[in-house]
Amino acid sequence: MSLSKVSVENSLKPEKFVKISWVDKLLPNYFSILKYLSITDFSVVKAQSYESLVPVKLLRGVDLTKHLYVTLLGVVVSGVWNVPESCRGGATVALVDTRMHSVAEGTICKFSAPATVREFSVRFIPNYPVVAADALRDPWSLFVRLSNVGIKDGFHPLTLEVACLVATTNSIIKKGLRASVVESVVSSDQSIVLDSLSEKVEPFFDKVPISAAVMARDPSYRSRSQSVGGRGKRHSKPPNRRLDSASEESSSVSFEDGLQSDHT
C-alpha cells in the first residue's frame, strides 16, 4: 500500500472549523474542548475493485479512555491520480459513518474527482459528536467508485489521504442546566456561592416547555408562569413540579445537507 505524504497542516487549523470564545477557554476541563488532534489515514484504490468501501481509522492515536465524546470538527480528503494526464474518467469519493443502516444517511462528505485534475484537496466540516464507546469501534469507511478509468485490473490509479481534526470532551450539551450554571461562574470575577446561582437555575426550569401530552397525563406539570399570581408573587401552594422528566417539546433543529468544501 502506497502512502501519501501530502501535508495538511494548514488545512486543519482549528480556527478554520470552529470559533472558540473566551468562555470556552476559561471553562473547566469537563465542559471545554480539551484537545485538537490531526489524524491521517491512507487508502489506495485498486482498479480491480471499481467500487469499494474501505474501513478508515480516523482516530488513530487519539486517547478516548479519559473522555466521553469525540467531535469531528473537520475533514480534509487529498488525492493524487497515478495515471497519465490524458486519462479519462474519474472517481466519486465519500466518507461514510457505517453505524447508519442507509449509506445515504451515513454519508459525511461526498465529492467527484476527475482524472484530469492531477492533485486535489477537499475540505469538509462535519461538526458532529460521537460517543467515545462508538468511536473506539472505528465506524467510518471510505467509499470509492471509479468511473470510465481505463486502467487494467490490479493497478493503482489513485492514492487518497484522509485527515481529520477532532476534539475530545466530557460534555456536549450546551443548552442544559450544567452549561448555564458554569457560564455564570466563569462570567463572574467574584467567588460564587450556591445560593447566588438560583437566578440561573430557577429561570432555566421555567423556560423549558412542557408539551400538552405531558400536561394531559399529569396535571401537576405546570410552568411557573401559571403559578405566579403577579410579578414577584407566587401562590401559597404552587403545584408540584417533577424535574426528572425530559421535555417532549424542543426547539426546531435544521439539518443542512450541503457541507462546506474548499477545492485546491
Swiss-Prot record:
Xref: Pfam families: MP (PF01107)
Coiled-coil ranges per UniProt: none
Presence of the UniProt keyword Metal-binding in the record: no
Biased composition (Basic residues): 231-240
Gene Ontology cellular component list: host cell cytoplasm; host cell plasmodesma; host cytoskeleton
Disordered as annotated region, ranges: 219-264
Subcellular location: Host cytoplasm, Host cytoskeleton; Host cell junction, Host plasmodesma
Matches recorded under InterPro entries: TMV_movement (IPR001022), Viral_movement (IPR028919)
A GO biological-process term: transport of virus in host, cell to cell
UniProtKB keywords: Host cell junction, Host cytoplasm, Host cytoskeleton, RNA-binding, Transport, Viral movement protein
Molecular-function GO term, any one: RNA binding
Role according to the record: Transports viral genome to neighboring plant cells directly through plasmosdesmata, without any budding. The movement protein allows efficient cell to cell propagation, by bypassing the host cell wall barrier. Forms a ribonucleoprotein complex with viral RNA. Binds microtubules and modulates microtubule stability. Can bind double-stranded DNA.
Family label: Belongs to the tobamovirus movement protein family.
This protein's name: Movement protein
Protein source organism: Cucumber green mottle mosaic virus (strain watermelon SH) (CGMMV)
